[in-house]
């Protein structure tokens, strides 16, 4: 490992290894055996990181638990665990780590649940290693990498930063509670030498509003977790903020494509119905269909240069009068209006057309806008059947903790 180099949460790699061995010893002492599921109900920070790597040393399967869940949801996720960890793990250091195989499950990772009930996905040590190597090949790797993580560690986008950084022997900074001003300040601070940060679109928008410009050491903002409005990318470009739009999902151990290009070693194809299909060493074997591909449920296409474009979700397509409408396309047009801060497009039953297109819109502070103005804005940029039949002005939109729109709460 990296010895005295900082690993995460102020711990050097030597200190992290010592803490992980103590955590592994505590797990073994409490009867955890290789392959046993261990629920990690810990706040993000050094104790969580030590417990995670302790699970790996003991050959156990780590299951990160979201502490914000209700009692019933937590019980459902913890019921198969042989141990629920709620306090720091400290025991006699485990001297001999369990010999692991690439096909051994490392983490039971729950999906975000934005479009369906959250479900556990088994991700192996081989999945994590393949993902880390492919990501480094796509984005490059700075020996002095410092990766800021404001994403929840209970989701794959956040946890992947911890695991990749350990594989690279580089530094991760865990930011347990996202605050736009604090993130903007950290990225602007040359002394912190932050080279990478992972954000979702709503986070980036807030960081830019907080005044981030020309961060001195930043190589990339890895931006994913939902549709990325072109207007947001333009704002980032004007501010001198380097953005790598990223497409991924839990079943693929986070990244599938970055800046439109599939990661090295990852195969992507478009099915006849425009669904994106994926396979590769980063994909959970349990997520593969009988045809050997991960059917993502996302819709997409390749542009003239061979770059992957995401056009929407199969389950979210609105069928109005026999025409298909992708909500993300309409949202992107709405967000081009200077008075619009956020937008969500969804469907409502329509006796004549089957479904009608409806938009919920959040205006920027101090802005005013009539429904007719916004519909006229869309009419000049979209086919008539895609223009929202109704526009509702709201104060906020329902989003998951990773920034994904929860459309079902509006429709």
Please report, for each region that a protein language model flagged, where it lies by residue.
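Conserved ATP/PPi-binding loop(s) of AMP-dependent carboxylate-activating enzymes
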Residues: 242, 261-265, 269-296, 301, ...
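Gly/Ser/Thr-rich phosphate-binding loop
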Residues: 194-199, 203-259, 267-269
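Conserved AMP-binding/adenylation subdomain of ANL enzymes
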Residues: 129-146, 154-196, 210
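Conserved AMP-binding A3 loop
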Residues: 10-14, 106-133
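Conserved pre-ATP/AMP-binding loop-to-beta segment of ANL
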Residues: 3-6, 92-110, 117, 126, ...
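Conserved AMP-binding/adenylate-forming core of the ANL superfamily
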Residues: 4-32, 36-39, 43-45, 72-74, ...
């Amino acid at each position: 490992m990296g010895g005295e180099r900082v690993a995460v949460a102020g711990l050097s790699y030597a200190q992290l290894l010592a803490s992980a061995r103590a955590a592994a010893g505590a797990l073994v002492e409490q009867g955890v055996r290789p392959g046993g599921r261990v629920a990690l109900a810990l706040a993000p920070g050094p104790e969580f990181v030590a417990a995670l790597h302790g699970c790996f040393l003991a050959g156990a399967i780590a299951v990160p638990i979201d502490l914000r869940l209700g009692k019933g949801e937590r019980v459902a996720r913890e019921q198969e665990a042989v141990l629920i960890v709620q306090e720091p793990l400290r025991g006699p250091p485990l001297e001999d780590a369990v010999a692991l195989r690439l096909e051994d499950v490392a983490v039971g990772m729950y999906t975000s649940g934005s479009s369906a009930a959250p479900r556990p996905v088994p991700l192996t040590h081989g999945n994590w290693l393949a993902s880390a190597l492919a990501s480094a090949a796509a984005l490059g790797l700075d020996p002095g990498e410092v990766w800021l993580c404001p994403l929840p560690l209970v989701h794959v986008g956040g946890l992947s930063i911890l695991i990749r950084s350990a594989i690279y022997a580089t530094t991760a900074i865990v930011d347990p509670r996202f605050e736009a001003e604090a993130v903007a300040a950290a990225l602007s601070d040359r002394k912190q030498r932050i080279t990478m940060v992972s954000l979702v679109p709503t986070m980036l928008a807030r960081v830019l509003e907080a005044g981030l410009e020309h961060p001195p050491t930043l190589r990339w903002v890895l931006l994913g977790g939902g549709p990325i409005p072109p207007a947001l990318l333009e704002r980032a470009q004007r501010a001198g903020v380097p953005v790598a739009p990223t497409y991924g999902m839990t079943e693929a151990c986070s990244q599938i494509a970055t800046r439109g290009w599939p990661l090295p070693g990852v195969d992507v194809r478009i099915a006849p119905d425009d669904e994106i299909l994926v396979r590769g060493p980063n994909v959970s074997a349990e997520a593969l269909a009988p045809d050997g591909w991960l059917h993502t449920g996302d819709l997409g296409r390749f542009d003239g240069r061979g770059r992957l474009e995401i056009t929407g979700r199969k389950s979210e397509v609105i069928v109005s009068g026999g025409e298909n409408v992708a909500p993300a396309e309409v949202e992107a047009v709405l967000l081009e209006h200077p008075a619009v801060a956020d937008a969500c497009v969804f469907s409502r039953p329509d006796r004549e057309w089957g479904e009608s297109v409806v938009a919920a819109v959040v205006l920027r502070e101090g802005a005013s806008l009539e429904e007719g103005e916004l519909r006229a804005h869309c009419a000049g940029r979209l086919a008539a059947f895609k223009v929202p039949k109704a526009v509702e002005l709201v104060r906020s939109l329902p989003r998951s903790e990773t920034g994904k729109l929860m459309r079902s709460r509006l429709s």
